Amino acid sequence: MKAFKNRVFEWLDHRTGIETNIRKFLYEDIPASSGWHQVFGSVAVFLFLVQAFTGILLAFNYAPTPGEAYNSMRYILTEVTAGRLMHGLHHWGASMMIVVVVLHMVQVFLFGSYKKPREATWIAGVVLLLLTLTYGLTGYLLPWDNKAYWGTVVVTQIAAGVPLLGPYLSRLLGSTGDVGVVTFARFYAVHVLLLPPATGLLILAHIVLVRKHGVAPVPGDDQLPSKKFYPRQAFLDTIAVFTAFVILFTLAVVAHLPLERLADPSDTAYIPRPEWYYLFLFQMLKYFSGPMEVFGSVVLPGLAIFLLILIPFIDRTPLVRVSKRVFAMACIVLAGAAWGGLTLAAVKSTPPSGVAASIDYAGPIDWMQLTPAALGRGSDKTAPDFAVAGAKLFTKKGCAACHMVNGVGGKLGPPLNGLSSRRSEEWVQENFIHPQKMAPGTIMPAYPFNETEMRNIIGYLFTIPE
């Protein structure tokens, strides 16, 4: 049996070279100084794989349209087995990946590992950091709650303010002052279709460059015998990865991530709050108002990125021990103090978070029933076109988050079955346009539909049976 197994492995290795390459990878020479400070790269790759895996699991139950995204998130959090855990792993995994990538770059900068011939490796790392931050930016909108909506409005407004490119960026983002279906679709496409393969290819290129030039040594390594990656460094990397997973799993289980209320474009009093890793930029914008806003939102971040890319070409001094890189330490301390100070100021000056949605985590909310066909169960295949169009508009606006139809939906507003027997068409139309006038104290926003939309949605509502 053992001889047969050896023949199989020999056949595979002869055809694919997989065993030879694995051995070459594990037994590669690394500097004698290698140790704990070089585990961050492996942890970052692990967290990327976690993000890909949990993202795929979430996508199985996520509806990528504004009308259904919010309800599908409710469904994931309430009905899908381990849905809240997967959501927590994905959310906190994004934050941890940013932390680990930043720590990895700090370690590389502190040790001077970006110096010749490793300039391209450093630049690939900078681009990976930007891609990691872009994940958080594009994924922020996808829950389609108030926090997601208004946070993205700020992003699109910043993009619109970029000199010369503003109008083109707004068009690219599908936003001309508001955030709608086009913006949602493009953020989703970037988050799911573009960023993962781009990140995977860049990680592969980064690893190839590291293997080509080797792990950067420190002064004195040439006087000591080199080590093999396996077993000691592989063991340290494994311990670091396991520790990261324990921290991530604990956060996903303990830290509750409630949805806020359904995105409300009319809630102009809402104060958007970005994720913690963007709070420093959020605070910096407060110091640059009016014509100077573009300086804080575009110019300073752009200069910082440009400077990061140029570091290997600016610092051409000989490699020295970390203890002698005083200027590098001062730069890290200064950057950390600036980031920490701005973040702390943002936390102190930001009002409490928005009101969480009233979600019964013990009760089922099947978003698959919140489709035009199911919402209009009284409207079968012979239903008039206006009723079908109205059902689609009802879904698009997320009305089922507050109103129950055929026993499915929210309970914030009155159930809509039998509406035609309780209200006239004129009353419903006026309620859409001036809800506070018709029902003082209501939380329902105004919906100034055009004539066709108004006719369609009222027609649909009046086809819903008792």
Language model regions located:
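Electrostatic cytochrome c docking/interface patches
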Residues: 367-395
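Terminal regions of secretory-pathway proteins
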Residues: 337-345, 361-374
